[in-house]
Amino acid sequence: MTTKMFYDKDIDTTPLENKKIAVIGYGAQGHAQANNLRDSGFDVIMGLRPGKSFDSAKKDGFEVYSAAEATAQADVVMMETPDELQAAVWEKEVEPNLKAGSYLGFSHGFNIVYGLIKPNADINVMIIAPKGPGNIERRQFVEGGGIPSLYGVHQDPTGDTAEVAKAYAKGIGSGRAGILETTFEEETTEDLFGEQAVLCGGLTQLIEAGFNTLVEAGYSPELAYFETSHEMKMIVDLIFEGGFEKMRHDCSNTCEYGEMLNGPRIITEESKQGMRDVLKDIQDGTYAKKWLAEYNSGLKDLEKMRTEYKSGLYEQTGKKVRAMMPWISDADKYSTAADTEQFSAAK
């Protein structure tokens, strides 16, 4: 089935004009969306708790309130707190102050799909999901571009939620790149699967396994890092620009033959079955239950895994290699202050 792509020229922003937008959260997506919307001429306020994000939003010139106060003023409320915090923020601050006929938005459908947030039937519920991290979203917008977004509708009592969602997506710059329709279930399932099986989980395991294979065979960790990790961006850029065809065209014949011959030895039927198992856990809610149980237990397993990865040879080698390339830090100029502080030591 062909999915229609919407661009700036296709979208009327009138449904969003004269509406006050409250963005709840000022992390990567909240920061990017709030700033992009304001630069597009929309009326944006922030709903935040006291802390670094509150101070950062104030410094950036926003009117900042508690989530409850911002919700009470707003026509559109965009939930941009982390997935694991949204249900509590919703229950304590947003739901009691949300007016009938308001528009409740999400950038990820986790809490709706798994039943953690259940808005009343008189609330319009929509999703606007940018397909990229917040700092890239902001950078592209400032430089005159945008990143694609998905939009969808879960509840539509006023009958115009899709138009409001598309106008919002245009406001954050996605109409410059393309806006596609989705559903909450589709976005949530595909997003979680992509992160876990390919983009983050699959890719990091592949990179580290390749790195360790070379090091265990006696090769230099620094050179192993270059071959299995540093060059990854260049290959992905080629795929991003023109698919596998461009990547293969720009690589040598030796590379192309070896890739086609030996790639299937790495991604085997067993690997594919693992992907199907991951997908099933996402679809039936198993992963969501595990993640919420982990969060509610204090993130003990996650913190343990974080510590193990940070102290590993791959990460330590990466720090040495990245120190040779100080220009990499230029990518951080559109990150939030909290992001920059958190990751500066990892350069």
Curated annotation (Swiss-Prot):
Residues 3-182 form the KARI N-terminal Rossmann domain. Mg(2+) 2 binds at D191, E227, E231. Substrate binds at S252. Pathway: Amino-acid biosynthesis; L-isoleucine biosynthesis; L-isoleucine from 2-oxobutanoate: step 2/4; Amino-acid biosynthesis; L-valine biosynthesis; L-valine from pyruvate: step 2/4. GO terms for cellular component: cytosol. Binds 2 magnesium ions per subunit. NADP(+) binds at Y26, G27, A28, Q29, R49, S53, D83, E84, L85, Q86, G134. Pfam families: KARI_C, KARI_N. Mg(2+) 1 binds at D191, E195. It catalyses: (2R)-2,3-dihydroxy-3-methylbutanoate + NADP(+) = (2S)-2-acetolactate + NADPH + H(+); (2R,3R)-2,3-dihydroxy-3-methylpentanoate + NADP(+) = (S)-2-ethyl-2-hydroxy-3-oxobutanoate + NADPH + H(+). Its cofactor is Mg(2+). GO terms for molecular function: ketol-acid reductoisomerase activity; magnesium ion binding; NADP binding. InterPro entries: 6-PGluconate_DH-like_C_sf, KARI, KARI_C, KARI_N, KARI_prok, NAD(P)-bd_dom_sf. Residues 183-328 form the KARI C-terminal knotted domain. Keywords: Amino-acid biosynthesis, Branched-chain amino acid biosynthesis, Magnesium, Metal-binding, NADP, Oxidoreductase. Gene3D superfamilies: 6.10.240.10, NAD(P)-binding Rossmann-like Domain (3.40.50.720). It comes from the Bacteria. Involved in the biosynthesis of branched-chain amino acids (BCAA). Catalyzes an alkyl-migration followed by a ketol-acid reduction of (S)-2-acetolactate (S2AL) to yield (R)-2,3-dihydroxy-isovalerate. In the isomerase reaction, S2AL is rearranged via a Mg-dependent methyl migration to produce 3-hydroxy-3-methyl-2-ketobutyrate (HMKB). In the reductase reaction, this 2-ketoacid undergoes a metal-dependent reduction by NADPH to yield (R)-2,3-dihydroxy-isovalerate. NCBIfam families: ilvC, PRK05479.1, PRK13403.1. This is Ketol-acid reductoisomerase (NADP(+)).
